[in-house]
Amino acid sequence: MTYLTRSPWILHYDASSCNGCDIEVLACLTPLYDVERFGILNTGNPKHSDIFVVTGGVNEQNREVIKNIYEQIPDPKVVVAVGICATSGGVFRECYNIMGGIDRIIPVDVYVPGCAARPESIIDGIVKALGILEEKRARMRQPDTGKKATGGETV
């Protein structure tokens, strides 16, 4: 991986879950795990973010919210689905209002399975997302060759 030209910013959104993965995402920001050592910064504004980290599954109420946030993030952007609920719907999959994983409504680049996903796995997924982000940035600088982007990498 080449050196980053600027620090990537992540935006975390909890769709609908037990909040176990949210606690683990927040643990990544503490001094014990210190995700900022990779140059990653947390933001609350989608217009400033590069990496969209989603925990929890999609339900009828948050479907449009997730799409709206995704559309506000400038290109190139990377989506990381954290936890089994975000990847497939998890234990709530059979509930009447759960549609499934995040990939039902927006494209996902990195999947971090687990219930709850461990901070080490989340950091590994975000570091993989950094590589994908740099690839997407490089492709945006080059003329279109007609090749499709590969995604859906599992950590």
Q: What are these model-derived regions, one by one?
A:
Residues 1-155:
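Iron-sulfur-associated redox domains of electron-transfer enzymes in respiratory
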